[in-house]
Amino acid sequence: MPHQQILILFGLLPVATNISTWWNFGSMLLACSSMQVLTGFFLAVHYTANINLAFSSIVHITRDVPYGWLMQNLHAIGASMFFICIYTHIARGLYYGSYLNKKTWLSGTTLLIMLMATAFFGYVLPWGQMSFWAATVITNLLTAIPYLGTTMTTWLWGGFAINDPTLTRFFALHFILPFGIISLSSLHIMLLHEDGSSNPLGTNSDIDKIPFHPYHTYKDMLMLSLMVLALLTTVAFFPDIFNDPENFSKANPLVTPQHIKPEWYFLFAYGILRSIPNKLGGALALVMSIMILLTTPFTHTSTIRSMTFRPIMQFMFWTLVATFTVITWAATKPVEPPFTAISQAASTMYFMFFITNPIVGWFENKIMKYN
């Protein structure tokens, strides 16, 4: 009986009639999360968290374990799919003013931070050359913290350099954090249903709502099918498209790769970090590139919620998307002219979007008042 009541509630969940395809990414993220936990479990069964055996255990999974290649590729490419969905989900939230649901937005930003931490720990686990050096560079940023930095870094590493204890604790963290993500996702969904979803018009949709099932479930299923198709096509035909060639070599602390870079979904933050010549300044900019999302609910000054009717903000939003892409591209290049200057200009423009947001809102209010 209780499960029937849940189904009835799910079917009767009132949702605005006019929400577009951009609102489908929440359910796609839920599907990605489920797939990552399942494939991750099957990989963890065969993985060995030891610096001498980790790389060999990945080779063993892909070569010897039945369908191990499928699990490994689904997990790795699934992570990229996860980030494509989450960045689109955040972009939709910024464009349509979903951040004004403060509790939902703040829990979502916390989820993003947890997801990025989990993905970072996971990238270290294969113990390839790029995994090792990316971990060295990123964890070394902790030393920029005054007084406590060196102690914290040694504590995180479990020694005076990245070694076996580091890999063991990164595996433990990579295994446990997804359960935190699942818990926080449940809270995120509960907080969302407290206020209800926004819509493309940014208006109150209480007078025009339809049941979630069957209308939006079928709509969600279409996008889920397309996502699964894209994922399986990539896994089958381009399994190494997101991999770094350096990571096919076992980690060697004595040989530094020519160009150290993390996975593509961290490149925008890494590009911002690299654009500042000062270590502490770069580390702060890296943290702020994510944390600045927390400010958006408090800096919204416009009387209009959605950017649908805000042409100036639309221009700024698409400039932000272009800036994000440029920083990602520049971060793949060596630290030399003109890439350094491009990164610095793009990083400045990235932060300018969030800084000028309240000023543009105030300006729009003035124009509307005079009209």
Swiss-Prot record:
TM helices/strands, residue ranges: 25-45, 69-90, 105-125, 170-190, 218-238, 280-300, 312-332, 339-358
Molecular function terms, GO-annotated: metal ion binding; ubiquinol-cytochrome-c reductase activity
Cofactor(s) for this UniProt protein: heme b
Keywords tagged on the record: Electron transport, Heme, Iron, Membrane, Metal-binding, Mitochondrion, Mitochondrion inner membrane, Respiratory chain, Transmembrane, Transmembrane helix, Transport, Ubiquinone
Positions contributing to heme b b566 binding: 89, 188
Biological processes per GO annotation: mitochondrial electron transport, ubiquinol to cytochrome c
Subunit structure: The cytochrome bc1 complex contains 3 respiratory subunits (MT-CYB, CYC1 and UQCRFS1), 2 core proteins (UQCRC1 and UQCRC2) and probably 6 low-molecular weight proteins.
Main function: Component of the ubiquinol-cytochrome c reductase complex (complex III or cytochrome b-c1 complex) that is part of the mitochondrial respiratory chain. The b-c1 complex mediates electron transfer from ubiquinol to cytochrome c. Contributes to the generation of a proton gradient across the mitochondrial membrane that is then used for ATP synthesis.
Protein name stated in the entry: Cytochrome b
Provenance organism: Eryx colubrinus loveridgei
